[in-house]
Amino acid sequence: MKALTTRQQEVFDLIRDHISQTGMPPTRAEIAQRLGFRSPNAAEEHLKALARKGVIEIVSGASRGIRLLQEEENGLPLIGRVAAGEPLLAQQHIEGHYQVDPGLFKPNADFLLRVSGMSMKDIGIMDGDLLAVHKTQDVRNGQVVVARIDDEVTVKRLKKQGNTVELLPENSEFKPIVVDLREHNFSIEGLAVGVIRNGEWL
């Protein structure tokens, strides 16, 4: 990485802090306002300079299309609460990055998902655990998957037959989720490949 000027470092720090506090990068207008630039165009020029130096990536066509490359390379992205209808790996869902070797899991983990609820506790996936996920749609019946039904994301064991998908919990207190593929949007976000235990259970 090339050294940043003082002003570029200010812009970079603002982006990083804004993501940490709000879960999403700032707009050009917000950068201009916070740092006293005359216009969003001035902020854009600084963003382009940061992109040339390899510390951010500018995603075209989005007002908040800024991605911190340094942090992406520094561990697996940790996905927290997922907003309805938005991509799982959208920047605003990334709580941070976790220092773990993706190669510890087979196949390799692409991201971590913070587990909410106890529907899979009988196979050791507890509330608050970090689920290691391999991003793929190539899954088989009987595997534990991260699935999206319409706007909701869930972790369950997959059973598919014809136009019907059953998402099976591993806890007798929960009922299977039955999905009619003719009536609902359904997709697989990834395959569960491991768990990092929440220390509160130890």
Curated annotation (Swiss-Prot):
Record organism: Cronobacter sakazakii (strain ATCC BAA-894)
Complexes and interactors: Homodimer.
Keyword DNA repair: yes
Active site, UniProt feature: S119, K156
Listed PANTHER family: LEXA REPRESSOR, LEXA REPRESSOR-RELATED
Annotated region of DNA binding: 28-48
Protein name: LexA repressor
TM region positions: none
Enzyme nomenclature, EC number: 3.4.21.88
Family statement: Belongs to the peptidase S24 family.
Taxonomic classification: Bacteria, Pseudomonadati, Pseudomonadota, Gammaproteobacteria, Enterobacterales
Keywords of the record: Autocatalytic cleavage, DNA damage, DNA repair, DNA replication, DNA-binding, Hydrolase, Repressor, SOS response, Transcription, Transcription regulation
Coiled coil region boundaries: none
GO term, biological process aspect, one: DNA replication
Marked site (Cleavage) residue numbers: A84, G85
Pfam name, any one: LexA_DNA_bind
Alphabetized GO MF terms: DNA binding; serine-type endopeptidase activity
Catalytic activity: Hydrolysis of Ala-|-Gly bond in repressor LexA
Task performed by this protein: Represses a number of genes involved in the response to DNA damage (SOS response), including recA and lexA. Binds to the 16 bp palindromic sequence 5'-CTGTATATATATACAG-3'. In the presence of single-stranded DNA, RecA interacts with LexA causing an autocatalytic cleavage which disrupts the DNA-binding part of LexA, leading to derepression of the SOS regulon and eventually DNA repair.
Highest taxon above the source species: Bacteria
